[in-house]
């Protein structure tokens, strides 16, 4: 039975706030402060979240970062991360493990997220007006601790549908994320 392998942890949807990056989180960008970074300390560690070919990633996993005051209380890898920056939804990590401790790669890079590479995508065209569209559910903004929980899988599906509309060239990956979320919903209704 195929379903035996399904992760038993319930699906959790987390909207996580990250520092803006005009290079789509594929390399360091200097736009956040308007001047060059001084030393390794100030580089936002999320700068490489969507540098999928970075040698630090494996064939199937991408290593990313989000700054949490305290990490979300989730187990396993049945977690969707919806990345949020400057009021916009900018991308997704699917089937993500969230580590309790940040792991340093070198003095510039570290990670606390391990996501499934073929369920991870940055949106060339970002989603804005997210509160008006109901994408934050009842929240007025993403929590000060760096993230908030979204409670309804339908919210994620609605966000992904808009992402596909705005980014048809990323439809394959976005549909895969949707399929995964929808398969989780069927699990819980059995």
Protein language model features and the residues they cover:
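Contiguous surface segments at macromolecular interaction interfaces
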Residues: 2-43, 102-190
């Amino acid at each position: 039975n195929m379903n035996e392998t399904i992760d038993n942890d319930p699906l959790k949807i987390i909207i996580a706030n990250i520092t803006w990056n005009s290079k789509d989180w594929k390399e360091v960008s200097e736009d956040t402060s308007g001047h060059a970074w001084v030393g390794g300390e100030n580089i936002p560690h999320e700068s490489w979240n969507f540098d999928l070919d970075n040698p630090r990633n494996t064939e199937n996993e991408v290593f990313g970062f989000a700054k949490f005051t305290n990490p979300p209380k989730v187990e396993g890898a049945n977690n969707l991360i919806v990345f949020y920056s400057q009021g916009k939804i900018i991308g997704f990590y699917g089937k993500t493990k969230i580590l309790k401790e940040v792991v340093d790669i070198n003095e510039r890079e570290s990670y606390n997220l391990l996501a499934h590479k073929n369920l991870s995508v940055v949106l060339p065209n970002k989603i804005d007006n997210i509160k008006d569209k109901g994408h934050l559910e009842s929240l007025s903004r993403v929590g000060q601790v760096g993230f908030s929980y979204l409670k309804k899988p339908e919210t994620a599906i609605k966000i992904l549908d808009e992402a596909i509309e705005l980014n048809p060239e990323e439809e394959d990956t976005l549909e895969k994320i949707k399929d995964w979320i929808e398969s989780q919903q069927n699990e819980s209704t059995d």
